[in-house]
C-alpha cells in the first residue's frame, strides 16, 4: 500500500496485505457515497440537468412541473423526485422522451405523471430518451 500524494491522497492496495484503513468519508465523482445530494429548485418549475444524476430533486412549489428533456440523461442514471410539501407536482416527459410507469406490470403505460404531496418517485434511465418511473404517491 502506498500514498500517492502528488494528486491528492490516493491509496492503492495490491498483493496480499491485510490491515485496516480508517476514513472520515467516501467521495466519488458525484459526491458523498453514503448520502444523496439534493437539487433544490425552490418554488419554480424545473428541467432535469445531466448533473442531477445520482441526486434527488426537492420539489417544493405547488403545481410545479419537473420536466425530463430529450438527450439529457445517460443509461444507468438515477434521479429521485421528492414532493416534500403540500400539493402535487407534475413529472413531464419532454418531447422525444418515453417514460414507462412500472406499476402496470406490462410497462406499456407512458405519459406525464402526478406526484402527490409527501410522495417520492425514482427514475432510472435505460437510455438517453427512455426511463422507468416508480414510487409512492405516483399516478
Identify the residue ranges that each predicted region occupies.
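Exposed extracellular interaction/assembly regions and N-terminal maturation sites
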Residues: 27-95, 128-139
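Tight coil/turn sites that cap or link beta-strands
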Residues: 6, 71, 94-96, 116-120
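C-terminal trimerization/auto-chaperone modules of long, extracellular attachment fibers and adhesins
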Residues: 10-22, 47, 67-69
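Terminal beta-strand-rich extracellular "head" domains
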Residues: 95-115
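Right-handed beta-helix
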Residues: 1-16, 28, 98-103
Amino acid at each position: 500500500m502506498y500514498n500517492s500524494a502528488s494528486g491528492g491522497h490516493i491509496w492503492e492496495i495490491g498483493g496480499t496485505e491485510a490491515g485496516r484503513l480508517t476514513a472520515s468519508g467516501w467521495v466519488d465523482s458525484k459526491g458523498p457515497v453514503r448520502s444523496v445530494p439534493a437539487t433544490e429548485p425552490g418554488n419554480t418549475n424545473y428541467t432535469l440537468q445531466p448533473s442531477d444524476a445520482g441526486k434527488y430533486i426537492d420539489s417544493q412549489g405547488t403545481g410545479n412541473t419537473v420536466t425530463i428533456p430529450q438527450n439529457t440523461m445517460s443509461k444507468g442514471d438515477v434521479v429521485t423526485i421528492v414532493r416534500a410539501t403540500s400539493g402535487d407536482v407534475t413529472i413531464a416527459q419532454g418531447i422525444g422522451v418515453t417514460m414507462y410507469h412500472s406499476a402496470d406490470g406490462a410497462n406499456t403505460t407512458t405519459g406525464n405523471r402526478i406526484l402527490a404531496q409527501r410522495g417520492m418517485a425514482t427514475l432510472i434511465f435505460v437510455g438517453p430518451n427512455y426511463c422507468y418511473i416508480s414510487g409512492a404517491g405516483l399516478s
